[in-house]
Every structure is written in C-alpha cells, then in structure tokens.
C-alpha cells in the first residue's frame, strides 16, 4: 500500500482546479478523496458548489444499478446467466437492426438471448448508433416509465449478436436491468434502491425525482463556447435529458450529492459495507471489479467488470491495476483503488468535456496518482 502525500495532493488539485476555473473549463465542481478510512481532500469550486449541492449523475447511475442487480444475485433471485426473456417474453421477438437513413432496418434475429451478464457488460447488443436512433425516436408514452421503456427497447431491437461485440449502452441495457429488478421484487425501482442501498448508506439526497428543495440545490448546467462559460441546455423538470422523473432510468436518471456518492464509493471500497450496514458480500464486490469481457473483444487498458470499468493493464498509466469505477455524461467521475485503499469522487455538471473520456476525469486521476508516495 502506498500512502498519499497530502501536501502534494492539495497542490496538484488546487493548481489544476484553479486553472480550469480560470479557463472556464468548469463552472462548479466538488471533489472528495478518502484513504484508509480518513478524509484526505475535500473542496468545492465555483459560486454554486456548496455542501449539499445536487448533481446530475448521468451514467454514474449505472454502478448503483449494478449493485442493485448483484444484491438480487446474492439472494439467488437473479442469475448472471438469466436470459432477458425469462422476465420479458417480448424479447423472444427482438430483431437485430442496423441504421439506414436514420431509420432502423431489421437484418435478422439473434441466435441467443441477451443475459443479465451481457446487460451489465455492454455486450447485449444495445448501444452505439442503433441506440442513438432509438433514443431520438422514443415516443412520450414509452419514455414515461421504466416498464414502458423496456417494452419499447424489446421491439426496437439490438445492433449485434450478444457477446460478439462491445458497444456502450447509455440507457437501454440498464433500463432493462431496472425493469427486471422491479419485476423480481414487485417494488418500484426507486423504492427498492431507497430501502436496500440509499437508506443503509446514508444517501438521503440521491433520487430520480428531486423535491422542490433539492431542485433549489441543483448545480446549474455549464457549457463553454469560444473559450467562455455559458449556461448548458437542460429540459425543465428532467434530471437526465428528456427523461421524465416518473421513468426511473437505471442507466442515467439519478441525482445525488458529493456526500452521498462518496458513501456509495466507500461502501464498495469496504467490501460492500457502510457504517455497519452490509449491502453486498466482499466476494460480490470483488466479482463486480473483475473483468468479464475477454481481451479479444476489448483489447484495451480498461475492460468492463459488472457495471464499472476495471484497469487491466499497467500501460493505462493514470491509475494502478485493479482500480474500478465509472463516469457520467455531464462530467461526474469516481474510482475505487483497492490496493491503496482510496476512493476519489469528482462532481461537475457540464455539456463541455463529459463522459468516460473527459479530460477533467483524466486530470483528476493523474493528480491523485502523482501524489502517491514511493
């Protein structure tokens, strides 16, 4: 285990963040780092970033859905090998489609059904250009609830034979997972998360449907045009794009705070336990942090575990082997470093420089890693 040089950590992060603020690369941001059970860094940047500020998580919702699914796997109510049509017979007619002139054209039927494992590892056939078209064309009724959305995606199709390719699914795969969880538990997905993850982890501000008071704490969306900061586009009353708050989008729909998500990350670092409350078994967290996509399908320095990416090669450079975590379209980012007992969380909401390849996320990783001693 290598400890962080706290003085160096503060220097790295303060210099970087001030530079990004001055260049209008970020408008507001909140950072929190922990090592070996102790806070090592915590700071808010920008005029609106305060204790309790609420951020749109976007795809940093996915690890929460991953934990929810794996809790049911532990309870033997769900298996990674379960095909989707076990829960949704509609999927037995799902087509493989391609995009032609912004239309989806059927080109065949899959030989095998997508499974829970495929949904968690972005190998189900959902995603990419096909899902982009599906998202643009989804009708208001299909977009209104998670169950309606699952039926829509079952009819709209997948882009390839499951587990023959890797294609990031922004919403569809994890919407299907959330729908499956609702059917297994006979509970609304938001209620299941509250009772089984949020309440035990002390995540009191994590929600699909913010209250009026939480909306008042919501960080404004930022953008950057011609080197100048400007307001970013949002849809009134929606946490993620045009998804209504009645649709508990398992891939992108949650809002949360720095404090709440840090609790979630620390739970993962602690092997599934937070404040004496057991969410998952240590071996289940380890399974989530294990690559499940072969290098032949994903010859990269990071590969998909269950709902999160895992550093699998030393030439990744910015983080040690075995670190795992994920990001969001609006610039949120986190990782867990089991070897050095670190959790690090970066919150921002911006249409400039977001997603898994955000420059600010890469800089955050570099600045923390360069502060490790030895």
Where do the model's predicted regions map?
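A short acidic/small-residue loop/turn micro-motif
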Residues: 47-49, 350-353
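Short, surface-exposed loop or secondary-structure junction motifs
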Residues: 94-321
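Short, well-ordered beta-strand elements
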Residues: 335, 341-350
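Generic C-terminus detector
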Residues: 351-374
């Amino acid at each position: 285990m290598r400890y962080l040089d706290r003085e160096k950590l503060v220097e790295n992060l303060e210099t970087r963040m001030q530079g990004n603020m001055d260049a209008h690369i970020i408008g507001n941001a909140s950072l929190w780092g922990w090592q070996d059970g102790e806070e090592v860094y915590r700071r808010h940047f920008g005029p609106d970033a305060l204790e309790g500020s609420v951020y749109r998580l976007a795809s940093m919702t996915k690890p929460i859905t991953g934990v929810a699914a794996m809790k049911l796997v532990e309870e033997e109510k769900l298996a990674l090998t379960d095909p989707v049509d076990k829960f949704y017979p509609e999927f037995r007619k799902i087509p493989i489609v391609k995009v032609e002139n912004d239309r989806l054209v059927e080109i065949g039927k899959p030989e095998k059904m997508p499974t829970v494992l495929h949904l968690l590892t972005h190998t189900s056939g959902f995603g990419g250009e096909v899902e982009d078209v599906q998202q643009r064309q989804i009708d208001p009724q299909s977009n209104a609830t998670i169950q309606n959305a699952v039926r829509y995606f079952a009819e709209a199709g997948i882009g390839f034979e499951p587990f023959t390719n890797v294609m990031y699914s922004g919403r569809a795969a994890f919407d299907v997972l959330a729908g499956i969880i609702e059917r297994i538990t006979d509970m609304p997905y938001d209620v299941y998360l509250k009772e089984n993850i949020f309440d035990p982890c002390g995540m009191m501000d994590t929600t699909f449907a913010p209250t009026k008071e939480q909306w008042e704490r919501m960080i404004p969306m930022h953008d950057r045009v011609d080197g100048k900061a400007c307001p970013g586009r949002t849809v009134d009353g929606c946490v993620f794009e045009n998804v209504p708050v009645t649709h508990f989008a398992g891939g992108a729909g949650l809002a949360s705070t720095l404090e709440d998500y840090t609790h979630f990350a620390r739970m993962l670092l602690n092997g599934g336990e937070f404040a004496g409350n057991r969410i998952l078994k240590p071996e289940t967290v380890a399974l989530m942090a294990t690559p499940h996509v072969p290098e032949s399908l994903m010859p990269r320095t990071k590969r998909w575990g269950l709902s999160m990416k895992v550093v699998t090669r030393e030439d990744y450079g910015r983080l040690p082997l075995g670190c795992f975590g994920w990001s969001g379209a609006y610039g949120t980012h986190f990782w867990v470093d089991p070897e050095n007992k670190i959790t690090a969380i970066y919150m921002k909401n911006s249409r400039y420089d977001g997603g898994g390849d955000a420059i600010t996320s890469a800089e955050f990783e570099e600045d923390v890693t360069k502060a490790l001693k030895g």
